[in-house]
Amino acid sequence: MRSAPGIDSAVSPVVGSVTVVMVGTGETRLVVLRGNSASGKSSVAAGLRERFGRGLALIGQDNLRRGVLHERDRPGAANIGLIDLTARYALDAGFHVVVEGILYADRYGDMLARLRADHRGPTHAYYLDVPLAETLARHATKPIADEVDETRLREWFRPRDLLPGGIETVIGADSALEETVGRIMLDTGLADLPALDR
């Protein structure tokens, strides 16, 4: 008998004194989209959902951190665990999952590494590498441009804040939205999978 999503002790190996809880299936896809503010992460995630259809869960850092918890982005903040739990639950429920956000490597890297290691299916990570000048230009067109000024945006900006181990595919600013979405659909195999009737 299978327990609630995220809790499957029958197939959870014990490593040392830590129980590793495997999530998802061999068929579920996990996609991680990272990059600086205004690098196009949310647009790419929305494009993936539009292209794929039902059965693709979008887990946005901004939605959970700012919208649900209304907390600052700090080391050890509660949103890190909430992103992890939400992704695991969706994977165990049979959804393909896109986790997207700035997700600074030093704050979110350990959580993302564990999630990647625990996922039974293929995991693909992408870093949208947009230079500061382009970030500033794009940000000026966003609804939150009045709330977040250029000084703050410069403070947030981290050039090539890549996860260790070379696990991310870097996509430059010269890649158009449709091109990026198409590439990720092909890389991950989502292009060949049917939408789920949910």
Question: Over which residues does each language-model region extend?
Answer:
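Hydrophobic anchor at the beta1->P-loop junction of P-loop NTPases
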Residues: 33
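Walker A/P-loop
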Residues: 42
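ATP-binding Walker
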Residues: 39
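P-loop (Walker A) phosphate-binding loop of NTP-binding proteins
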Residues: 36
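Conserved substrate/cofactor phosphate-moiety recognition/catalytic segment
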Residues: 46-92
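Conserved phosphate-donor/acceptor-positioning beta-strand/loop module used by diverse small-molecule
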Residues: 119-138, 171
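Small-molecule kinase domains that catalyze NTP-dependent phosphoryl transfer to phosphate-bearing small molecules
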Residues: 141-198
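Glycine-rich phosphate-binding loop used to anchor ATP phosphates in small-molecule kinases
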Residues: 75-122, 127-128
